[in-house]
Curated annotation (Swiss-Prot):
This is Ribonuclease PH. Belongs to the RNase PH family. HAMAP family: RNase_PH (MF_00564). Its EC number is 2.7.7.56. It comes from Mycobacterium ulcerans (strain Agy99). Homohexameric ring arranged as a trimer of dimers.
């Protein structure tokens, strides 16, 4: 198999680094790096839910995605300055939220909210997939925080791990984890969100330069799922380390009647 411009095989991910405890204030805080793409993912816990959710006994998970002005070579204005959130930002924010809600039992949260924020510090392709992969680790830490505080009705509300990766057809070849140089000229561009149980959460695919046959779709999915297995292993290794902050003390155990 011939090498790509950065020396990788077609089925090889860029170097993946997951750093927990990147900042101190949120319950979960992660810096994830896919090569030169760097995304800070935080998961903050707040008591209560939105008005439409009150009285349901269910929690909620929401997500926001944004890029810092200097994340790309050319500085872009903050969307808050423009006075509106762009369509791409809204789309990716919703994608991150949908992806993470696929793995958590919201009933176990009670009426509490987990707010996930993904901020792209440096972009070189694959920012949304890096955001989802890192956000899962931040979410897992937030769940540990809630469990320590005695806020969960189920101590293990996460049913699976979530990871995401980009795949595409570049120069007629199926490739995984596209940097900007490849993504900008891909004939087919696809993002795949998957669980560690082998199921799919979301598939976003477009024939940018040409149509493509079903056989190519199968190759893209096979390569994406293989890459996600590598990402799941990286998440597992990161989460095997102790919680990087200070966990709250839970409520004291209730006394048995007559004690």
């Amino acid at each position: 198999m011939s090498k790509r411009e950065d020396g990788r095989r077609d089925d090889e991910l860029r170097p993946v680094v997951i750093t927990r405890g990147f900042t101190e204030n949120p319950a979960g805080s992660v810096l994830i790096e896919f090569g030169r793409t760097k995304v800070m993912c935080t998961a903050s816990v707040t008591e209560g839910v939105s008005r439409w959710r009150k009285g349901s006994g269910l929690g909620w998970l929401t997500a926001e995605y944004a890029m810092l002005p200097s994340a790309t070579h050319t500085r872009s204005d903050r969307e808050s300055v423009k006075g509106r959130v762009g369509g791409r930002t809204q789309e990716i924010s919703r994608l991150v939220g949908r992806s993470l809600r696929a793995c958590i039992d919201l009933a176990a949260l009670g009426e509490n909210t987990i707010a996930v924020d993904c901020d792209v510090l440096q972009a070189d392709g694959g920012t949304r997939t890096a955001a989802i992969t890192g956000a899962y680790v931040a979410l897992a830490d937030a769940v540990n925080y809630l469990a320590a505080a005695g806020k969960l009705s189920d101590p293990r509300p996460l049913s699976c791990a979530i990871a995401a990766v980009s795949v595409g057809v570049v120069d007629g070849r199926v490739r995984v984890d596209l940097p900007y140089e490849e993504d900008s000229r891909a004939e087919v561009d696809m993002n795949v969100v998957a669980t560690d149980t082998g199921t799919l959460v979301e598939v976003q695919g477009t024939g940018e330069g040409a149509t493509f046959p079903r056989s190519t779709l199968d190759k893209l999915l096979d390569m994406a799922l293989g890459a996600c297995d590598t990402l799941f292993a990286a998440q597992c290794d990161a989460l095997a380390l102790p919680y990087p902050g200070v966990l709250p003390e839970g409520p004291p155990p209730s006394k048995a009647f007559g004690s």
